[in-house]
């Protein structure tokens, strides 16, 4: 299954993205989701195929969600994931001497 998708970012929550079918745009996204998400800001369009790799999402799940519900919501990574990627010297800044 191939699908041209539009990706929107949330102005309220860093690293929160909404994937939708480009032809349908935001028409199938519930208002109850758009209120906390904020006014979606278009980032880019891309062709999704089962072979394509996404950085933080399973492309099969994204395609399935768009097919079934009209959108896929990518949540920001958890705080633990941010901490794992910090340089060691930053992690030690608050350590007692």
From Swiss-Prot:
Occurrences of domain YcgL (ranges): 3-87
Signal peptide from the UniProt entry: none
PANTHER family assigned: PROTEIN YCGL (PTHR38109:SF1)
One family name in Pfam for this protein: YcgL
HAMAP family named among the record's database cross-references: UPF0745 (MF_01866)
Native source species: Pseudomonas aeruginosa (strain ATCC 15692 / DSM 22644 / CIP 104116 / JCM 14847 / LMG 12228 / 1C / PRS 101 / PAO1)
Protein name according to UniProt: YcgL domain-containing protein PA1295
